[in-house]
Amino acid sequence: MVHNDFTPNFKQTIQPLLDENGSNPSRITVYNLWRRFDEDGMDAPFALCDSRTVSEKELIPTDLFNYGKEEEKTETLADENGFTVEIYQSMNSDNHKWYFYPKMNRDEVVMFKTYDSNENPFMPTLHTPLMI
């Protein structure tokens, strides 16, 4: 599934946690790291889309239920079922420019931004593992 892990609504999602901790950050950013963990090759090579080639009209806000693992939950954000976060899925476009990482080794990592509260307009970094 081609997606970005968050939409511009992410700050609203975590606002109860910020309030609980008395935190009022001027900026929130979220970065993802993608790394291969298996020893003998990637069964799902990674693909990353240049955010400058993505149009807002191609994005589909989608609720992802039960987000977060048990040990990551807080009383403020989640119960035993996790919590709901809004992600972007994307329609396909010939305008998308993709970068592929088919032969990463365990010492390589790709870092990319998935949320920035100061970014206007919000530019999601679409990504997906390629199931081949």
Mark where each language-model region is.
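Catalytic core of Fe(II)/2-oxoglutarate
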Residues: 83-132
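Non-heme Fe(II) oxygenase catalytic core, chiefly the N-lobe of the double-stranded beta-helix
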Residues: 1-87, 95-96
